[in-house]
């Protein structure tokens, strides 16, 4: 969905 997290972009 293009949401940034510390693990990567989801």
Swiss-Prot record:
Q: Where is this cross-link: Cyclopeptide (Ala-Ile)?
A: 1-10
Q: How is it modified after translation?
A: This is a cyclic peptide.
Record's miscellaneous remark: Latex of this plant is used in folkloric medicine for treatment of infected wounds, skins infections and scabies.
| Job description of the protein | Labaditin is an active peptide which inhibits the classical pathway of complement activation in vitro. Activity seems to be based on an interaction with C1.
For this entry, the protein name equals Labaditin
């Amino acid at each position: 969905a293009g949401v940034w997290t510390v693990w990567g972009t989801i």
